[in-house]
Amino acid sequence: MVKIKVCGIRREEDIEIVNKYKPNYVGFVFAKSKRQVDMYKAEKLADKLDVSIKKVGVFVNEDIEKVKEVSFRVKLDIVQLHGDENEEYIDKLKGFKVWKAVNVTAGKDVEKFKNYRIDAFLVDGYDGTNRGGTGKSFNWNLLKENQDKILKPIIAAGGLNIDNVEKCIEVLNPFAVDVSSGVETDGFKDEEKIKKFIMRVRKFK
């Protein structure tokens, strides 16, 4: 079954919603973003999260010691790197589960995937400025053509919503799908959209 991550959790109301519908993962964004939370806020929210839901911390080119501090404080299950982090940086996170986000714009982007020693790749859209949470999708067919070269679980992100997530799964059959802006209304997580998104994903066995 395709797993689900709801990213950009930042309010107690968001925690109540995800506790009700139980995605597999939630994401706390520690990088500069309109969904950013600090370590202390994330810790309070995480304490109220259902124990069955895994916690992912999203970082962009953050100091490695800060990543470790936040991870221990919030009790993160996974570190998601959404910047220009290289192999040397990732090697310093030995002992942590790491997802590396990559923007797919050409075949060469896919080629470099296999050089990273991580647990999964999160493939996201790119709007030319922002890293993730942009509502922009990527070329699923380009990724599909190169999937056999990656040899790691793929998490599909970027512009997913209740209208296109089924097609994404049909094309890619990813390990997981990651949604943020696609389940928001006026910049806030929308319970009905989260419910429908999760229902549509979970119909795939």
UniProtKB/Swiss-Prot annotation:
It is an enzyme of class 5 (isomerase). Keywords: Amino-acid biosynthesis, Aromatic amino acid biosynthesis, Isomerase, Tryptophan biosynthesis. InterPro entries: Aldolase_TIM, PRAI_dom, RibuloseP-bd_barrel, TrpF_fam. Belongs to the TrpF family. The gene is trpF. The lineage of its organism: Bacteria, Bacillati, Bacillota, Clostridia, Eubacteriales. GO terms for molecular function: phosphoribosylanthranilate isomerase activity. This is N-(5'-phosphoribosyl)anthranilate isomerase. Its EC number is 5.3.1.24. Pathway: Amino-acid biosynthesis; L-tryptophan biosynthesis; L-tryptophan from chorismate: step 3/5. The keyword Hydrolase does not apply.
